[in-house]
């Protein structure tokens, strides 16, 4: 998610401070999001999608991937749990 945000921002010639101002977040936090040290709160996704002129669904999918990874990556049985979730969702 963060890498894609940085890619979009740089592609549009925008500065961190411009995204920060649009989302009412400080530059340091946006930098941590781009460097994948923090996850942007979900409530900011719609405004970010509008600001960057990208489909909300694109950002939401990437955001969910990172959110899920952050939950299970430190769990010894995370992959197994994810398999059960996928199986359950396919019912």
Task: State where each predicted segment sits.
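Short alpha-helical DNA-recognition segment
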Residues: 13-32
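Helix-turn-helix DNA-binding elements, focusing on the entry/boundary residues of the two helices
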Residues: 5, 16, 27, 42-45
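A short, Lys/Arg-rich alpha-helix, primarily the initiator
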Residues: 1-11
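The alpha-helix within a helix-turn-helix
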Residues: 9, 20, 49
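Interfacial/linker helices and their anchor residues that mediate assembly or domain coupling
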Residues: 60-91
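DNA major-groove recognition helix of helix-turn-helix/homeodomain DNA-binding modules
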Residues: 24, 41-58
């Amino acid at each position: 998610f963060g890498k894609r945000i940085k890619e979009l921002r740089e592609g549009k010639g925008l500065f961190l401070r411009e995204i920060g101002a649009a989302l009412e977040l400080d530059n340091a936090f946006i930098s941590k999001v781009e460097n994948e040290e923090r996850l942007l709160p979900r409530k900011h996704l719609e405004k970010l999608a509008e600001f960057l002129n990208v489909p909300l669904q694109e950002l939401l999918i990437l955001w969910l991937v990172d959110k899920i990874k952050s939950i299970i990556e430190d769990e010894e049985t995370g992959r197994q749990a994810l398999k059960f979730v996928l199986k359950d969702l396919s019912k």
